[in-house]
Amino acid sequence: MKRKFYIIGHNPNSVRNAIRCLKDGANAIEPDIRYLPQYEEKFFVYDLLTLDRKQRSLRDYLIGLSAALNDEKLNLALLAFDLKPICSKDFESESVLYMKEFFEQLNEYFFSTYSQLPLLLTVGKPSGKPLLVKAKPWLTANQAVGVDEGDTPENVKDFFTREDMSFAFADGTSSPFASPLKFKPIIKEAVTLKQHTHELKLVYTWTANSEKTMRNFLDLGVDGMITGRVSRLRKLIDTEYHDTIEMATAEDNPFA
């Protein structure tokens, strides 16, 4: 059986960039979410660490993405959101309300139309895991949570297994001064763990831009990669790896 795979567009924090990633061959996107309660919209899609710092409301992003998917024949198989900032002490006291309002927007402006599409919510620090637990009342069978930086597969497994939640694991770097291959041992550990536990559903890495890095992680058995070179990774999968890997579709549930 071929391995279902997710090419995840890197920082598609505008609908235009998201659609470009999908047209280039991605089947997943992971925009950044910031919570700014001082504004009426509260949830915004942008990242302070990227060049594109324009604040776009989550509402407008979801409406635009939904409309674009309706107009274009694109294969979006997974919608992931990287939740930032993680959890300050002030933030923790609002986390229940945060998740309630977050899912209200997700369901009203997107999942009311695309309910079959899998959803993944991630945080980039171990301290963010309690926030993800607050999402539990709203998660459905094709939705899960995960940690994508600064943790270990075993710690993530222990935490979310206790909470009876399906989860994903990732690690990597976008730094020009460090190779994602530095994280190969911990990703290998996660892939091995996935083979032995039902709860760990998805293992991926970031940001894989060179063919060497892509091949290393494809051979390792990951389920996906975040990349800024979508067409390069897609070509590699469609040629050298087409016998063992196939692109997931919206009908596939990685969290089943």
For every predicted segment, state its role.
Residues M1-A256:
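Phosphate-group recognition and catalysis centered on beta-loop-alpha active-site segments
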